[in-house]
Structure formats: structure tokens, C-alpha cells
């Protein structure tokens, strides 16, 4: 088996609004959308600097729904950018909720975390140093040992 691509495909309650948010917060560009006669968006694609994010409105009749407010989500979308502080600020200004301010992390990245208005969690980071897996494990173990 050969995997050619892997896409995140998010379900949101209002895809049109999500497209506007992702454009404002992350500079995403709409590639296409498929709209039902009712106005519900069955599929949309956004370009994030060469990476595609897929979106669709909820289809509860098929068990397809987005995260519920206050219920959390088991998935975090990680976006690697040039300046995490700037992008976190843009996301919050666009309507995201700040979950964690950007800070330098043991794994060689400066990163922060936001939750978008549709319940999806985004980790936003940029590289600050190259860290080998062995050094990363050492730092992780050391960090966990601190009270």
C-alpha cells in the first residue's frame, strides 16, 4: 500500500462561517465548495499554503456532527507557521478561544493552542531548534520528574 496524501476533514455547524474564520485567522484560501439546494455545504476545500483542509456542514441524519460546546475534542490540528505568537493572536482576534499562550517547548518548538469557534483545537507552532528524539525524551523525562 502507498499513501499519497492525508487530509484533515472537519465537520462544522456552519461551513460558510468556518471558511471566513480560517481565512481571517490562518490566511487559508477557498479552493472549492459543493452546496446543496438547501444551502447546506456538503464539501469544501481550503488551501493552507499548499496543504488542503476539507470541511463540511453537519449531516446529523448520517451521524456526522462537529464537536459539541463544552465537550472537548479528541483531535488537535497542528499547524506549523513562521511566527506562532502572531498566528495565535490572529486566531484569537478572529474569534478563537485562547487555551494556551505560546511558549518555548522542550521539543524545539514555540507553540500555543486555541479552540476555534466550531470546537476544533489547533496547536500553532514554529521551530526554534532541532532536537533529536533522544534529547527530546531526556527533556520530557526531566520535565515530568519536576514537582
Which residue ranges define each predicted feature?
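Vicinal oxygen chelate
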Residues: 1-9, 20, 26-115, 125-147
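Short acidic-aromatic low-complexity motifs
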Residues: 12-16
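C-terminal catalytic core of tyrosine-transesterase DNA break-rejoin enzymes
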Residues: 118
